[in-house]
Amino acid sequence: MNKLKKEYLFFKQQEPNMRTLLVTNMLYALVLPIVEIFVGAYIMRNTSDPVMVAFYQLAMYIGIITTSLVNGYLLKKYSVKTLYSVGILVSGISMFGMMTIKSLGFIELGLAGFLMGAASGFFWTNRYLLALYNTNDNSRNYFFGLESFFFSITSIGVPLIIGAFISQIDGKEVFGFLFNINTS
């Protein structure tokens, strides 16, 4: 427990902007596996076709590459903080849009995947730039090490917790609603 306290005190010694960026990225790391699980499950539930999931992923990667390239031009006009925030907001808008579509076809999935990729592209490219601005040579390894550690832990732990929760709630009634993972 003493080591955790030392680590926390060291974290508190860092620049406020760096701490804020780390906390924001850690919260995003908690949400990211949920989003990825939800989107894949949502597409499979509505299409029953793994090809559609692969197509969505392909569109997402095209969106990441495209916005990573466009981001350089946008930085001439908008602040890095604005583009970083846009990346986070567009991911939520993309998921909401995908959920409101009545039928998921190639065009709808392509557009939703591209928007989710655009959100990721804006988030990651600007996150790296913010990390560069808010760290120095002495704190950069600490920043990326702590962030990588947290992303690794959440990428493994969150899906395990979600799976355990789903398996435990299956077949139970909560507030008059029967949870059955085998029915839609």
Regions found by a protein language model. Give the residues of each.
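Helix-loop boundary and gating motifs at the non-cytosolic
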Residues: 3-64
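Hydrophobic core of transmembrane alpha-helices in multi-pass small-molecule transporters
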Residues: 26, 105-123
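Transmembrane alpha-helix termini and helix-breaking/packing motifs in multi-pass membrane transporters
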Residues: 41, 73, 157-179
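Helix-to-loop junctions at the C-terminal end of transmembrane segments
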Residues: 67-80, 166
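C-terminal ends and interior cores of transmembrane alpha-helices
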Residues: 89-104
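Intracellular juxtamembrane helix-capping segments at the cytosolic ends
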Residues: 122-135
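Glycine-rich segments within core transmembrane alpha-helices of 12-TM secondary carriers
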Residues: 144-163
